[in-house]
Amino acid sequence: MPNASPASPLNAPLAELEQRDAFIGRHVGPNATEIATMLAAVGAPDLDTLIDQTVPPAIRLAAPLPLEGPKPEHEALADLRAIAAKNVIRKSLIGMGYYGTHTPAVILRNVMENPGWYTAYTPYQAEIAQGRLEALLNYQQMVIDLTGLELANASLLDEATAAAEAMTMARRVAKSKSNVFYVDEACFPQTIDVLRTRAGLFGFELKFGPAHDAANADAFGALLQYPNERGEIIDLSGTVAALKAKGAVVAIASDLMALVLLKSPGTMGADIALGSAQRFGVPMGFGGPHAAFFATREANVRAMPGRIIGVSKDARGKTALRMTLQTREQHIRREKANSNICTSQVLLANMSGFYAVYHGPQGLRTIAARIHRLAAILAQGLRDAGFNVPAGAFFDTLQVDTGARTAELLAACDAAGFNLRPVSDTVLGLSVDETTTGDDVATLLRLFGASGELAALDAKVGAAGGAIPAALLRDDAILTHPVFNTHHTEHEMLRYLKKLQNRDLALDHSMISLGSCTMKLNATSEMIPITWAEFANLHPFAPREQVRGYLEMIDGLAGYLKAVTGFAAISMQPNSGAQGEYAGLVAIRRYHDSRGDTHRRVCLIPKSAHGTNPASAQMCGMDVVVVACDERGNVDLADLEAKVAQHADRLAALMITYPSTHGVFEESIREICASVHRHGGQVYMDGANLNAQVGLTSPATIGADVSHMNLHKTFCIPHGGGGPGMGPIGLAAHLAPFMADHVVAATGDETRPNKGQGAVSAAPFGSASILPISWMYIAMMGDTGLKLATEVAILNANYVANRLAEHYPVLYTGSQGRVAHECILDIRPIKANTGISEVDIAKRLMDYGFHAPTMSFPVAGTIMIEPTESEDLGELDRFIAAMITIRNEIREVENGAWPTDDNPLKNAPHTQADFIAADGAQWSRPYSREQAVFPLPWVAENKFWPSVNRIDDVYGDRNLFCACVPIEDYAS
């Protein structure tokens, strides 16, 4: 047990003094004494007994996890550093949507490496997320300005999935009745790969051809690339107009850096613009994570995927920000949702937005102009040397006819430290980026045998005015809002970042007990490797011999995950939990199709399921059939059996979460899986609650055929304020041949019998650069630590449930009165009696310095608490004290001491303006100011002040405004 030691360390053996398990005691919050205290409180003599009372014996593992023992932090870092050293860093000129960039140090240190930014949750509780929301609004404004469209969302997962979302959005809003979607053949190949996967599942017909031929197509929509993958810049205005005249919806995939200079997609008439924001300060990271941008016309807002930040007002009339139009999202509309996307890429979107804030419009124009100038110099030098370089307009990318010298030149550039793109046996591609230097261009020209001097070439290019005709340059102002024209010194930027951070509550302040979200410790030692150059600066399509370290780390992590889940194969490609669901269901569908069972399209989903489940099933072309739950929160076995029998001939899958979203280990889970299997279906296990399984049971042991793992929950990747996430899937052997592959780069398993399965994400290993976080966590915890983490997560949840049960009914428990790793408190009786709702309790918790638990999921009118294993007894007791004090405040309403509409809950959260009565009014509420803002003695010691009062959600949805507001509005 961590933290236990003999009376004198001088008497301890060396094996103990080595402290190889020290990290376990850093990660698991309660020490041995606190564990004993909590066990006594819940009436269990030891952890083993508690687990026996909680987890059904039929699904328990028969042996410990087949993993090594724990490693000390320094040793795990050294081991991973040795693996990373096997990667070879080259100056990348591959392009294809991934480019070198300089992350400003002030953003790297104060955002990317700052737990105040990376440990926050998605900003559902907007009053304590105003800093992040302002940053995202800046990002949206940046995208709006550069794309020339009216509305942008707060990011999608990557450019390729954004293109797939554009295709499905086009189908929703297009007037054309065609089933054809036209794709510019000069789109990036990874985008085409993802489009093929999505279109096949929806039954869309893809038609490929040159962009200029799109106007002749009878299609419901089209995707055009600008600049295209060959680097060409073509004015698409006429093509767009012709397509729209036929009732088609037109999407343009573009490049934000190019759009600093180029005519915008909106100006050319596009309905949708999308692409990657990666080159705005986010490292390539072997494929991700990066924020994809997505913009459209305001008329399409209700059909747009992803989250949107909008402007509203608070109870004092002050400008306040929130996520707007949430009724579009999967957690509300389920199988009718626009998309299954839940987690997106908030941390990376914020970094890209801050990149624009820091550089401003003039700085960005200088960066973009420099990139173009270097590309133009390179083109001119190559032409002068006799190479055939296409004469059309370009921004940063050239495709050079190298003929029989292609292999020789590629090898020479490799030896000199450059990666070029081998387009074919006779053509090489070169993409210039922010990190390219004049010396690089001079070296490349020398390698190609060109003799021109850089200065002379520069003068020649300058006299010609570059390689972009005036008609293709933008003539409108961009980024005119003051936020993009103020913070250009490091002092000002640093203070702006700190001001925003101070408005947000993250794990660096207090526990975040969101049920089904697993907001556990994101240890510093786990985070350190993601900024190592060996992981951060590799292109996802770099030659395989240069990425041996990445492949070894990924293979090692896959081995860890196989041990934890019991599955035969792991696919790392899905870059969110929802994408994992999608990838797993795709594998199931293709498995059935391979057996001739193309009619198996029914997916059974319990009523309690997360909204992504039905949304993902719908995306895979499956028909969702809902299974009822009984009064104990379990799957209703009679209803399941009836529906399994009813749909036996068409049954494709059951999607089920375990432990259930009701926070209990269902004892009939094996029977449920067996019933589905008997009728020809497959079992998809949602891995949202895997944190209650690790080391005790596993998806494969339970009977699942495929499951995703939320690495941003169970395996310590931080939530980033709403992303990044990773959702790799584990598959049984019979499904392994049907997991995603990739058209550009191998996914690591060269022996799979089935090829051409298609991609679900842009990069072969998804957001590869954050995988070291999970590798470090598992390496440092080892077999014993992972099991202890699960046991303590269950103990902490039972302790919270036990302490709060006399104040709030615990809605569901197992047969022996235990909950799993989370518990649901029923607020409905309180609301019926007083009008005080779960929302009021959530807002009041802000006054105590806590983020609310999950509200109204999976049962309306409830709150779901998941404390995780990382919170110690002191923090649990503070949260419990806050909840009990709030219940006593509710009793004051129940007994008539406070009005139902004027009490600390209905008026929560309280701000500094409330406390000091800034408007000069006297305090006139029936409770004291101290009760409002310092309700318990310890609150004042570390007070978190919400920066706004309760936000008016209805006003925000009815008065849609999703761009930056005047600066003075923030002070109103």
Curated annotation (Swiss-Prot):
Q: Name one GO biological process term.
A: glycine decarboxylation via glycine cleavage system
Residues bearing N6-(pyridoxal phosphate)lysine are 713
Q: Which UniProt keywords apply?
A: Oxidoreductase, Pyridoxal phosphate
InterPro entries recorded: GcvP, GDC-P_C, GDC-P_N, GDC_P, PyrdxlP-dep_Trfase, PyrdxlP-dep_Trfase_major, PyrdxlP-dep_Trfase_small
Query: What's its EC?
Result: 1.4.4.2
Chloroplast among keywords: no
Write down the chemical reaction(s) this protein catalyses. Answer: N(6)-[(R)-lipoyl]-L-lysyl-[glycine-cleavage complex H protein] + glycine + H(+) = N(6)-[(R)-S(8)-aminomethyldihydrolipoyl]-L-lysyl-[glycine-cleavage complex H protein] + CO2
For this UniProt entry, the molecular function terms from Gene Ontology, in alphabetical order, are: glycine binding; glycine dehydrogenase (decarboxylating) activity; pyridoxal phosphate binding
GO cellular component entries: cytosol; glycine cleavage complex
User: Per the record's keyword annotation, is Oxidoreductase included, yes or no?
Assistant: yes
Superkingdom is Bacteria
- Which top EC class is given? oxidoreductase
In terms of CDD domains, this protein maps to: GDC-P (cd00613)
Q: What does this protein do?
A: The glycine cleavage system catalyzes the degradation of glycine. The P protein binds the alpha-amino group of glycine through its pyridoxal phosphate cofactor; CO(2) is released and the remaining methylamine moiety is then transferred to the lipoamide cofactor of the H protein.
* Protein family according to the UniProt entry: Belongs to the GcvP family.
Q: What is the recorded name of this protein?
A: Glycine dehydrogenase (decarboxylating)
Origin species: Aromatoleum aromaticum (strain DSM 19018 / LMG 30748 / EbN1)
| Lineage, opening ranks | Bacteria, Pseudomonadati, Pseudomonadota, Betaproteobacteria, Rhodocyclales
- What is the gene name? gcvP
